[in-house]
Regions:
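Substrate-recognition/cap helix-loop segment adjacent to the acidic, metal-dependent catalytic center
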Residues: 91-99, 103-127
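Asp-based, Mg2+/Mn2+-dependent phosphohydrolase catalytic module
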Residues: 114, 119-150, 154-198
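Short, acidic loop-to-helix structural element flanking the phosphoryl-transfer center
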Residues: 73-99, 133, 137
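Conserved Rossmann-like nucleotide-cofactor binding loop
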Residues: 10, 17, 106-107, 156
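Conserved SAM-binding loop
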Residues: 11, 98, 150-151
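Short coil/turn segments at beta-strand junctions that form active-site/ligand-binding loops
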Residues: 1-2, 96-97, 145-148
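Active-site neighborhood of HAD-like aspartate-dependent phosphohydrolases
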Residues: 1-38
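A metal-dependent, Asp-based hydrolase signature
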Residues: 28-31, 41-74
Length: 198
């Protein structure tokens, strides 16, 4: 069995913790949370660059601080936002069985991956700026005789992959309060039962 994991809000506590950390660092630099949140809603659907985000906010606020210093203060804390419980499970599964496929701005996502130190637990890591479909399909095709379990917190990415094209794919919506082992066991047994009925 092979496993594909998303990064943000699966392996990396992005929304509840890291984003809060970003806002606190910006406030410390003199950028109000309201201004930062408002601007974030304008740019979040595009390929996000934290460096550009900080630079624009500094420029708009006429704040004389170095973007690089604020960026470094934010990014240096990346290891503190890892879902260590899930990372332990990934380590148990083995590097050769695990892939990481994440959506976002390439430079920013890659920097989060590098600074958090998680890449060493995966046979391959992919940063995509559009659909995950192509990469997921490629992984499924490479392991067509095995089940490929795909964890993502966002239904749009889970639903993006055609089960007709990837019959060995088991998509699972990840929620932080669920027991990982139990989730895999239940979903895998359910899919095996469905396959027997066909």
């Amino acid at each position: 069995m092979k496993y594909i994991f998303d990064f943000d809000d699966v392996l990396f506590n992005n929304t509840k913790q890291f984003k809060e950390h970003i806002y606190k660092c910006l406030e410390k630099a003199g950028i109000s949370r309201t201004v930062a949140e408002t601007y974030y809603t304008e740019v979040r659907e595009k390929e996000f660059s934290l460096k550009n985000f900080i630079s624009t906010l500094l420029k708009r606020g006429k704040i004389d601080k170095k973007m690089e210093d604020i960026y470094e203060e934010i990014m240096s804390e990346c290891p503190n936002f890892i879902n260590n419980e899930l990372l332990d499970e990934i380590e148990r599964l083995g590097k050769n069985n695990c892939y990481l496929v994440t959506y976002g701005g390439k430079e920013f996502q890659q920097d989060k991956l590098d600074r958090s130190g998680v890449s060493i637990y995966f046979s391959q890591t992919y940063v995509v700026t559009e659909s995950k479909n192509e990469i997921i399909s490629m992984i499924c095709a490479s392991h067509k005789d095995e089940q490929v379990v795909f964890f993502d917190d966002k239904p749009k990415f889970l639903n993006d992959v055609s089960l007709k094209d990837c019959p060995n794919l088991v998509p699972i919506q990840y929620k932080e309060d669920l027991d990982f082992r139990e989730l895999v066991r239940e979903k895998t047994l359910h899919n095996l039962e469905m396959a027997r009925r066909r």
